Amino acid sequence: MAAVTQLGYVGLGVSNVEEWEHFATDILGLESNGVDEDGNLSLRMDEYSHRFIVQPNGKDDVEFVGWQVTDEPALREIVEQLRQAGIEVTDGTEDEIKSRRVEGMIRFDDPEGTRTEIFYGPPISFDRPFNSPRAVGFVTAEQGLGHVVLYVEDLDRTVKFYRDVLGMKISDFIRNLAFFHCNPRHHSLALIEAKSPKKLNHFMLQTQNMNDVGATYDMVLDGAMPLTRGPVSYTHLTLPTKA
């Protein structure tokens, strides 16, 4: 069975791209690639040419989630798994492949209607090292972007999809939450069963050290952004190593 290997990129639909660029660069420490001719902003956090694509459509929600696979055979195997599960799959257009800067991709909606993309040939910029405007570093590599947490109305159905069709493994269950991993990161995806007008609960970026977290927290306390939740310590960010 083919399986996704990491959270590759996230697309966001927003009301104000300029404010998002300020938030992403000045607060989070991501690097901006600027805005393209369609008004889309792309953002970097490592050697990939982008990890976020921000689109000016006013939704203020997740627009799509991109999962990486190892190669084209793995992508084609996942296509068959999706079709056997009754999911309508579409190959990425030339414009979409160019926009994502990947070698190949497919797209479909998950059982909750979240647009999902799977790609191979990651968008790496070998000639341009990541340059954070805040000198922040992020933990990515085989662990991917970080994690994304989505609201769902039918947890059982959606768990079966990500586990049995996309090959993710369950890390934990906590009441109405399910956590999935596809690499050493404890979870790259979490699902919350709850009614919500939005699909996105949050995304997580892991910095390379606690100092970066503290400096960002200080900026927020100084009024850079509204604080919705204070510091919290995760029990573990990666899966326990087997003895």
Protein language model regions, located:
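Core segments of cupin and vicinal oxygen chelate
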Residues: 2, 8-50, 96, 150-188, ...
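Vicinal oxygen chelate
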Residues: 6-15, 57-83, 104-110, 144-153, ...
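Short, structured motif recognition centered on aromatic/hydrophobic residues
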Residues: 7, 30, 43, 52-54, ...
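Intrinsic, low-complexity N-terminal interaction/targeting segments
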Residues: 52, 114, 126, 136, ...
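Asp-box/WD-like beta-propeller blade repeats and closely related beta-sheet repeat scaffolds
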Residues: 92-99, 132-135
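Internal, well-ordered alpha/beta segment that forms a basic, Gly-enriched binding/recognition surface
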Residues: 100-123
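Surface-exposed beta-loop interaction hotspot
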Residues: 126-153
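Conserved small/polar residues in nucleotide/adenosyl-binding loops
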Residues: 235-241
